[in-house]
Amino acid sequence: MTDKDGNKQQKGGILALLRRPSTRYSLGGILIVGIVAGIVFWGGFNTALEATNTETFCISCHEMGDNVYPEYKETIHYANRTGVRATCPDCHVPRDWTHKMVRKVEASKELWGKIVGTIDTAEKFEAKRLTLARREWARMRASDSRECRNCHSLESMSSDMQKQRARKQHEMAREDNLTCIACHKGIAHHLPEGMTEEDED
């Protein structure tokens, strides 16, 4: 079918155009454009991913900057004799790509909380602290404290260099197959009020 100027009318619009081979562009040209577009997309995606994986990004929200960041700065993970600092993503974002993507999707819930103001005041944050802590402890238990083990390893620890109490606790942890978070809650942030015996395990 042609219009009054003799041009063919497209049936089905954009879907039809996508289904039929192009008479104007070569397959090679389309392929090159697709590859370049893919590289640009992947580069942009990876840049955004890394930008959201920094301590600066984490504390850019006043909820984190005003509540947990000041208490983290008082811990051994912030300042210590070796000069090695564990930042927010070191503990809260997995390093391997698959688990990192899962965590980023989970973080969208936190972004929603920011938008609706779930913890936008110190009082609201404290009211939710136990819930937030329990969620993070459960995540760490489920992953066998994977992020802790990026820096710490029971197998690499020299027990004869540890204090007697620490040596005994780590030996028990090995025997009972415990994960780091079972004993080290509150290592980087204040423990929430209202914890139960169940939370202590």
Swiss-Prot record:
Heme 4 binds at C180, C183, H184. It is found in: Cell membrane. SUPFAM superfamilies: Multiheme cytochromes. Substrate binds at K104. Heme 3 binds at C148, C151, H152. GO terms for biological process: anaerobic respiration; denitrification pathway. The record marks E175 as: Interaction with NrfA. GO terms for cellular component: plasma membrane. Residues 1-24 are cytoplasmic. Heme 1 binds at C58, C61, M64, E110. It is a single-pass membrane protein. Induction: By anaerobic conditions. Residues 46-201 are periplasmic. Binds 4 heme groups per subunit. One of its GO terms (molecular function) is metal ion binding. InterPro entries: Cytochrome_c-type_ET, Multihaem_cyt_sf, NapC/NirT/NrfH, NapC/NirT_cyt_c_N, NapC/NirT_cytc_sf, NO3Rdtase_cyt_c_NapC/NirT. PROSITE patterns: MULTIHEME_CYTC. This is Denitrification system component NirT. It comes from Stutzerimonas stutzeri.
